[in-house]
Amino acid sequence: WIMGHMVNAIEQVDEFLNLGANAIEFDIDFDKDGIAQITHHGIPCDCGRKCTKKAIFTEYLDNIRQVTTPDDPKFREQLVLLALDLKLQRISSAKAYRAGEDVAKKLLDHYWQRGNSRARAYILLNIPLVEDYEFIRAFKDTLKNEGYESYNDKVGINFTGNEDLDKIRDVLEILGIHKQVWQADGITSCFARGTERLKEALEKRDTPGYNYINKVYAWTLVRKSIMRRSLRLGVDGVMSNNPDRVIKVLKEKEFADKFRLATYNDNPWEKFRG
């Protein structure tokens, strides 16, 4: 999975897909009451990027629904995963539950259209810190209360704050989540990051019977040397400001026979068995 990073303006969706991404990440900004308002990162952000691009969240969902719906004029077959980077760290943890309710309802109304949409992308909920786990509880409660629990099959969980992996496991245990879990490891493209935690996550992913990590990705990679390093370690995905660079690296002799781009037929919740 090549995840285009910080794709917050509607016009950026095609831009990143044209560069080779098969997944996009966008930031969800909330008001003080936990209501999702816009797709927006804000300052500071990655080096070399404009931090202020944005869209109304519901309008963004309406557009991305079309982009991921077969036979729609806007349909782009390659886009199979949407990562919602939830900026919960900007609001009180007491509002995390309200935020989870709101995002679930907006996805129901504008993306899935309560069963009337054929939009097919998988959804990855990126939670910044484990203290915000009530967002996940609320999201799942809302799908159940609204009568659409089946959409849980399309939704995965990912904690992005580089916290202790055992601490993350404990929170997932509290929530009763034993599947559909991704684990991110990374830092803004402005800085270098070691591989200790990334290697630990990959080791846990590959441990038989360990159900708290199905996929691991590294972020935000812009240098080809770091992309190569991550691929050699065996990551499932790369988040990048430059998907075209990832494509070029994947075509190199060292990687061409080991990796390919994920398609809709690849289940993002299953561990890869090479």
Curated annotation (Swiss-Prot):
Keyword flag Disulfide bond: yes
CDD domains, A to Z: GDPD_like_SMaseD_PLD
Tissues of expression: Expressed by the venom gland.
EC number(s) recorded for this UniProt protein: 4.6.1.-
InterPro entries noted in UniProt: PLC-like_Pdiesterase_TIM-brl
Needed cofactors: Mg(2+)
Species annotation: Sicarius cf. damarensis (strain GJB-2008) (Six-eyed sand spider)
One GO biological process term: lipid catabolic process
Reaction(s) the record says it catalyses: an N-(acyl)-sphingosylphosphocholine = an N-(acyl)-sphingosyl-1,3-cyclic phosphate + choline; an N-(acyl)-sphingosylphosphoethanolamine = an N-(acyl)-sphingosyl-1,3-cyclic phosphate + ethanolamine; a 1-acyl-sn-glycero-3-phosphocholine = a 1-acyl-sn-glycero-2,3-cyclic phosphate + choline; a 1-acyl-sn-glycero-3-phosphoethanolamine = a 1-acyl-sn-glycero-2,3-cyclic phosphate + ethanolamine
Residues that, per the record, bind Mg(2+): E25, D27, D85
Disulphide linkage map: C45-C51, C47-C190
Cofactor remark from the record: Binds 1 Mg(2+) ion per subunit.
Protein localization: Secreted
UniProt name for this protein: Dermonecrotic toxin SdSicTox-betaIIB1bvii
Active site positions: H5, H41
Record function comment: Dermonecrotic toxins cleave the phosphodiester linkage between the phosphate and headgroup of certain phospholipids (sphingolipid and lysolipid substrates), forming an alcohol (often choline) and a cyclic phosphate. This toxin acts on sphingomyelin (SM). It may also act on ceramide phosphoethanolamine (CPE), lysophosphatidylcholine (LPC) and lysophosphatidylethanolamine (LPE), but not on lysophosphatidylserine (LPS), and lysophosphatidylglycerol (LPG). It acts by transphosphatidylation, releasing exclusively cyclic phosphate products as second products.
Keywords noted in UniProt: Cytolysis, Dermonecrotic toxin, Disulfide bond, Hemolysis, Lipid degradation, Lipid metabolism, Lyase, Magnesium, Metal-binding, Secreted, Toxin
Family assignment from sequence similarity: Belongs to the arthropod phospholipase D family. Class II subfamily.
Keyword Secreted: yes
Primary location class: secreted
SUPFAM superfamilies: PLC-like phosphodiesterases
Any one GO MF annotation of this record: toxin activity
Cellular component aspect of the GO annotation: extracellular region
